[in-house]
Amino acid sequence: MEVKGPSGRSFCCESEGQFKSCLKRHTPSLLLPSSWKGNSGSCLMAKALHRMSPTPNSCPLPLPLCRMSGVLCSRNLFTFKFSLFQLDSGASGEPGHSLGLTLGFSHCGNCQTAVVSAQPEGMASNGAYPALGPGVTANPGTSLSVFTALPFTTPAPGPAHGPLLVTAGAPPGGPLVLSTLPSTPLVTEQDGCGPSGAGASNVFVQMRTEVGPVKAAQAQTLVLTQAPLVWQAPGALCGGVVCPPPLLLAAAPVVPVMAAQVVGGTQACEGGWSQGLPLPPPPPPAAQLPPIVSQGNAGPWPQGAHGEGSLASSQAKAPPDDSCNPRSVYENFRLWQHYKPLARRHLPQSPDTEALSCFLIPVLRSLARRKPTMTLEEGLWRAMREWQHTSNFDRMIFYEMAEKFLEFEAEEEMQIQKSQWMKGPQCLPPPATPRLEPRGPPAPEVVKQPVYLPSKAGPKAPTACLPPPRPQRPVTKARRPPPRPHRRAETKARLPPPRPQRPAETKVPEEIPPEVVQEYVDIMEELLGPSLGATGEPEKQREEGEVKQPQEEDWTPPDPGLLSYTDKLCSQKDFVTKVEAVIHPQFLEELLSPDPQMDFLALSQELEQEEGLTLAQLVEKRLLPLKEKQHARAAPSRGTARLDSSSSKFAAGQGAERDVPVPQQGVGMETCPPQTTARDSQGRGRAHTGMARSKDSVVLLGCQDSPGLRAARPTSPPQDHRPTCPGVGTKDALDLPGGSPVRESHGLAQGSSEEEELPSLAFLLGSQHKLLPWWLPQSPVPASGLLSPEKWGPQGTHQFPSAERRGLNLAPSPANKAKKRPLFGSLSPAEKTPHPGPGLRVSGEQSLTWGLGGPSQSQKRKGDPLVSRKEKKQRCSQ
């Protein structure tokens, strides 16, 4: 604190003792206090006074008598009071004959408040009081102006008071003049910023005179503010430190006021101003305060701000530790709500919006004090730049403050909703009481904070708090998204059981990625696909139908009810037998082919035409396209003329095979179970032509509608295995209408001439064998009697099962066997008895020719009248 003595020298005190010594040295008659009141033994007082740096420009007269009292508190807040007494030359030093000028300093960080109270001590007497010259400047850092109380006289006791003249000079060149009329405002020049032009301070001057036996003394309240005037709200933040509210006036910190604006508010009490001067009516305080009250300040005015009261009472209403005042924090909370839209505009997607809003409260106030003409955009720009240069450690205080404000906002919203619940349905007081109980635990935590006091009144008297929150509802509605997490936390505390279940359900799809699920589904489809087909033919057909569906865009997924009904029907043997009997062979052929190209439209039309045909007509119709396909696909077997030559070649082949010894002759036919058809146990190569496969499949497809097939069907349809066994010569597949395929082992001697003739015989056998299914199944005699002549040995015989037995073996999907189960001859001693097994045994091509043209054809014709016409054609061709 710099003080100029009578000689004009300035001194600075660094500590409490130095401050005392300086005052003693430069002020002759100084009464120091016996003790300094404070809560710490440090030199906070001296440091705070030194930060104020009051430097008077002039000190007209020395201070004969000075009484000082100081009060220290934490957070750099203090109140310092000078009691200055000036005695004239003829008056005594008694309190009753002196006029005291009391200077009160209230300091908080960069905000200082000086209150000057001039009052006579006791009863006034004759005489005039010389000038009192305390020079005081409440300015952070630099000296801007001087407040000087010039000499004034007190009139003799009488009916009226003497004139009062006080002159306060703001800068050296532009003094502030207070006229005698209390309604005249103070005027100052525009260059009131002083030499430095930096800094801002508020000086509150309260001048109170008590003369004579006047009951209600006159009180004057002057507010002198230097160039950057910004009225501060009670408890506003100044540089990050909470400062106490002003003693007299309060306003918002953001609204800039014109430079060098000085507002003078007066309030006259009983009595007159001066003798001979009219006493004008005192203007109401509301008419003088609006220019300095911000619209954003919703806080009430402190009591005693512009009314009667001594300095002690004024200071008692604004204690130094005003940071704990709920009213000041509540106003900061409202300012924070007003600043949040500004912060969101600059940081739309940042989570620092609430903290930045808290940061704007002190920064915008400081900027407005330094430069009141600064626009809001410029202030926000400077604040944002300051925020970017602020470290994370310094930001923590604003984050904590924002967290508390969010809690207050959430609590306020809850109070509003509760008031609505209480006001709306009057018949729900019992449900409302349990809702208040869960709020009990968070209440003590927030009660520790001083700001919770306004919201604390909500639960006690919700009906009385209904009107105040009403105007705040629009503000809180816009702020609903931030406090929602706090509300969720409360609900989690209320309902612990259901909350853990919901996250568990939502975490299930997050833990298992969809790619893994799809991969699992694909693997299961690959694993379960063959197993489903192995259970039976109906399931295999349905599975293949489902596989074809994604390939055909026109098809739609089947109905689950329809599928269950189909499964039920497929479980019935009679239904399966009937379905297999009427399945179109072309459809099965195309379905089982490697590259199917089905014409569903033509197939559907053809099936519609076949609905009106009888069984015999249907058989004939199916034989015609089979012949055409036979000629188109098999070049050696084109036309019926080839069948005539095939009989002679076939007979020659029979003679050639008879000459071959039994061990080396063609192989006996042995039955191959369905499980072993897919593999070649002998290690022989699997070679077959697509032509033979197509011809064999067509032949076996046509066998399904024969009466023998419909008479008896197998219980378990064969699998859709598609292996091939080596054939004779060219290894073409030979299909017989028997239930199981047979393999023909290579037992022919190497280098024999018969091996070269077998390829042509195999083609002939393939072409002639396709005619067998239409009359061979109807033979009533056993196959051994049909195909084995007496001169053949036991290994040169062919065995064919009876009609009933063959019907059972032909029932399972002939098409599947036509495509993938070729039959080959192998020698087997089964001539004497018919084979009861699933397949038929063929010892060679001789048996096939013998069965085609042998004496058993007459018996077969007798057994099957439906195919007699076809048999005649075959006999003619042979």
Swiss-Prot record:
Disordered: annotated segments: 273-324, 417-566, 627-757, 775-878
Source species: Homo sapiens
SS bonds (residue pairs): none
Domain of life: Eukaryota
Gene that encodes the chain: NUTM2A
Transmembrane segments: none
Annotated protein name in UniProt: NUT family member 2A
Ranges of compositional bias, category Pro residues: 278-288, 427-444
Stated family: Belongs to the NUT family.
